[in-house]
């Protein structure tokens, strides 16, 4: 038999293996091109090379989750699963979500990632808002610069925010402890509703209250005479009318306290309803909100209005109503109507800053909207008071930025370069100046530098806050203590020079400044005679026991008593530090005010100077006057107001 030589068979890969193969979106199945089934040899199955070494040796199926790191057999045997390093394996092991082999990030890393994402989203939203269609065809470099730059006025909380002084919160907490304010506004009142609106205040009294409002409060909201009070504003349903009567009632102590209390409740309820209205709001509604922002603590029987929240909501309404969102400050033509709008806008910005500083809360208004504030001074009818408001806005912004700079606060400077530059820029409002030519200032308002101005109080107040913040890092600094004492004495001495009529119309922020200055004196030197003087001044000033001046007077007296007990080791009495004694029983009914009846005759409501009586010290409980070195009453008008 003939043996034939058999040539070795050369293996040739079938043509179907060279054709393109597509991987599905889930990276799990290999799908050939359409039409490959016709050319693919029968019986040949292309196996994936993803089995581990153990399964290949045992010739068993390797059940491997593409997202896993070991097959089921190796997991059950508790041995290392050695997977082949192939390109397919590499593709299968890169899913969209993090696989099991990736370490779980720490909480700090996740928070950092979230914060970074939030900052990116905020920047995108600001860019979208600033790319409004109405200004897309205009060159707006100021607008572009104000987005997320160092010049932005959005001041976040800082690392030592909880340690910042909170003068407004401190005073409100002391009042709550002393007077025990209710936690909510009563829903019903015996005079609240239509019966009150239809004539609890007779027409003659209403006219007098409106005139008092125009003379003392109106110019701050562009109401300079009664003709500016339109007929629709005089409706009893109007929040502006109710607010005007409430503010002016302090000049008429003859109005019974229940009526004043009901007026306060009515204003609160109307304000709540107004804030829920669909924007844009009417101009007179924004005027009323501006008044409530400037005097949020006018009535003190209930918990005070949160000026920070109210002014923030009012700012949002004003942005829509004044159409500031679709324009830049440089576009405005300052006519009379725009000037009136800017005056309200400045009031909203200033009160937001007041309570941001006073409560150590953030301020988030971008610089592009703050650029509207100084535009008011370009109007020919701008007053000195308008200039003071703009200057105060800049001052409080400087204070917020300095407080947010921990390094500057640790350095504990006595004089800050930013404050000094501000003083130079606004020196004409800080010192006495002579008017040249015809004055444009309302006769009822003070000129720069006279004894009725409270503008300097804000400067000393901001300096005290900066020194108090620095004392968090240098608690034993005698230099800072001396500066705080000096600033507090300047504030009280300046306020004591005010006439009663002027002191009653100052904004509530001035009372918080004076109260905080008195608390600082009690803290460092409770024997300072200015404490008793300001306490009695506020007591004489208050038209009723619900007024802010009366509450602050009682608070100062009680705080001084506590400080004296803390410094006197011989007067240690159990519970003395948390007891107010008989001070809560104080009532202004003990003072002989005018008869508490609403007289229908207009002559029954005389001027304030004729209605404030001489208050004798024995008219008040011992807990209030025990800490005061008062030997005789201070008659009204005897002090140099």
UniProtKB/Swiss-Prot annotation:
Gene Ontology, cellular component aspect: nucleus
ATP-binding as UniProt keyword: no
Gene3D superfamilies associated with the record: Zn(2)-C6 fungal-type DNA-binding domain (4.10.240.10)
Main location class: nucleus
UniProt subcellular location: Nucleus
Pfam families with a match to the protein in the record: Zn_clus (PF00172)
GO biological process, one term: positive regulation of DNA-templated transcription
This protein's UniProt keywords: DNA-binding, Metal-binding, Nucleus, Transcription, Transcription regulation, Zinc
GO MF annotations, alphabetized: DNA-binding transcription factor activity, RNA polymerase II-specific; transcription cis-regulatory region binding; zinc ion binding
Free-text function comment from the UniProt entry: Transcription factor required for protein utilization and degradation. Regulates transcription of major secreted proteases including a serine alkaline protease (alp1) and a metalloprotease (NpI).
Name this protein carries in UniProt: Transcriptional activator of proteases prtT
UniProt organism field: Aspergillus oryzae (strain ATCC 42149 / RIB 40)
